Each structure stands twice: as structure tokens, then as C-alpha cells.
Amino acid sequence: MIIVSVMDKRVKALVENPSLTSVKGLDALETRKIVEMLTAIRVMTNPLQLTAIPSWKAHELKPRFPGKWSLTVTRNYRLTFFVDVKAQEVSVLDYEDYH
């Protein structure tokens, strides 16, 4: 899928340059996990494919936010994004503590 919009500047840096090993404001483990997740997002054709990795706890945030998905990066922080399966696009990609 194509990532069309990114809200968090740290994640945007990783989207633009996936070979980065460090980003200001993220520790090495967070950086590595986010890069892995971004790679999976790019190659997926359906967000249900992300559920193949149980530690990411991939799930849609419905009924409150239909179409918005969440992946667990750390105990409190999630990579969240909207998916348009027909257009094969991911938008409003963010790194947030929504709890």
C-alpha cells in the first residue's frame, strides 16, 4: 500500500528514509519496530494480514473509528492509520498514546 499522509514527524522521517537506525525522540527498539511495521504496511494488500504477527496486536478501532487500525509499538504507544483497501492507500499515519 502507498502511505499518503503521516502526522508524526519522527515516523515521517522513517517513511522517507527506512534505512535510518535512529530518530530523535525514539529509542532504538521503537525505531526498529516502527521500520518493521512500515515495511509490512507497504507490502500488505489487506490490513488483516497484519494480524499474522501477534505481538503487534493489530486491530481495527471500531465501532468508534471504523477504518482506523492500530499496531502496538510499546506498552503505551501505537502506530495508528486509516486504510483505504480499494485505493490501496494508508493515510493519517500517526504514533500516539491513545490510552
Question: Which functions belong to the PLM regions below?
Answer:
Residues 1-38:
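Arg/Lys-rich, positively charged N-terminal/basic patches that mediate binding to nucleic acids
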Residues 2, 22, 46, 57, ...:
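Glycine-rich, flexible loop/turn motifs
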Residues 3, 26-33, 53, 65, ...:
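Generic, well-ordered alpha-helical segments
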Residues 7, 30, 34-37, 57, ...:
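Amphipathic alpha-helical interface surfaces
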Residues 31-51:
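Generic amphipathic, hydrophobic interface segment in small proteins and small subunits
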Residues 45-69:
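A short, surface-exposed loop/turn module that caps and links secondary-structure elements
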Residues 59-62, 68-99:
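Enriched for short, Lys/Arg-rich terminal
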